[in-house]
Structures are given as structure tokens and as C-alpha cells.
Amino acid sequence: DDGALVSTEDVDPPILITKSDGSYLYLTTDLGTVVHREKSQKYDKYIYVVDSRQKNHFEQVFKTVKHFNLSSSSFIHVGFGTVNGPDKKPFKTRDGNVYKLSKLHEDIKEKLIKYNEDEDILNILTNTVLTFSDLLPNRNQNYEFDLEKFTDINGKTGVYIQYAQVRARKLLESKTEIVNTDIDTNFNLDERRLLLLISKFDYFYFQSFDNYQPHHLADYLYNLCQTFNSFYANNKIFSDDVPDSVKLKRIEIVNNFYTLTNLIFNCLGIQPVDSM
């Protein structure tokens, strides 16, 4: 009645195409984007990674696409929670209370410089902190932005996982050639725990991939690094009193851990550093 254009098709809730002043809505532009992509790209599946609070909006978008046969592709909304400040309230760009990425990057680097002053390594560590901190929580849950917590080398952080893989890398670089010996096949508790956890990679990978929930793989990576650090602390490798057969076994365990962590780093978009 006031000049707005509403579809008369049987779609619930009704589709508002244009407002009374002639302007378009998010739904209108999203539908236009679907039509454009259908003509120019035509993918089998479209995944919208958007705030969970937009759930109803995307349900209506996808329902409209199906109703009008705008595309035969599948459409999925992967929602995520909010990043909150110390006041437990979500950061909002319109309120002007959000970190600029450049400022955030510099603040993290300042906290990490005590671990390594090399600029290239600092940049990688900073990106690791940002990536891992965002992937670790269940994407459906809100989390509090805490710079101190995210950069704690002893916490559940990107710094911690980088330190573990660097430790493994250094062990492999310092190994000596061992020949004419069989590998020891008796495993202590630390060795069994680490190997058992390594064997569970497929499960956590597909939990993340099939459900669009990377926190399964991120949490698994942290537990893997934590278990490796316990193994490292309790088991000597290169000491003279360690038999060659045991050295060989433990080197292979370290190699398996290092290879797997680098694979998971790649899955999560994290670049390993060479040193810390």
C-alpha cells in the first residue's frame, strides 16, 4: 500500500523486493548475486559463512531460490558466533569499537617479539595467533577477544602449537645416522598415547570437513602438541644411555608427529615457522 513491491508468490514469509522509496534490500541483492553467479560461475555448492544471527535471512534467501528455480545448486549457511569485548558485548563496526586489523597485527607482534625478533617469523606467528584463536572455538559459540590469552605460549594458543612443531623440527635436524639396528617395538605409556592420538587424525579431519566446523581439527592439533610435549619431557632420545633401537623408534615417532602437524597446519591455513 505504501509503494513497496512485495512478491505475491506463496513464500513464507512474503518476499519484499523493493522498499517504498525504491531502494533494495539485502535479500534482493542476495538473489541478484545468485542469478549472476548462476550465469557466470555455476558451482555445485555455495557456502555462505555469515553471522548466525542472519540464519532466518538466509533461510528465506534459499527458500526463494528454490521456489523460483533460480539455481539447481545447493546452498548452505555456515553461521558463526560473535567476537565479544571485555564487556561481553559483540564488537560492532558501526559503534567504532573494533580493532583495525593493522593495529591488531602490531599489538600481537609486540607481545610475540620476546619469542623471536625476526620480522618474517614474527609475521607468521602473528597470523598464526589470529587464525588459531578464531578457529579454535566452536563456530556456533561466541568468544571473548583476549590478547593476553591468545599470545600465551603455555596456553591453548597458536604460539604453543608453533613451539611444539619447532621443537620436533629441531630434533629431526639434530638426529644422527643410525645403522645396523632393528627398531625397538616396546612402547611406553607416553609413546603409546602419542601414536594413538596420531592415528585418530582421519576422524577429526572429517568431523571438521563434513560439519563445516574447523574447531575439531584445531582442538585435535592442540591436544596432539600437548601430548608430544609430554612425550618430549619424559623421554630422552639422543643420550648415550639410550639404545640405538630406542633412539630409532623415538625419532620415527617424532617424524610422524612433525609430518602430521604440518599437514594440519596446511589444512587450517597456518604456515609453520622454522625457529622460535
How should each PLM-predicted stretch be described?
Residues 1-276:
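Non-catalytic interaction-recognition regions
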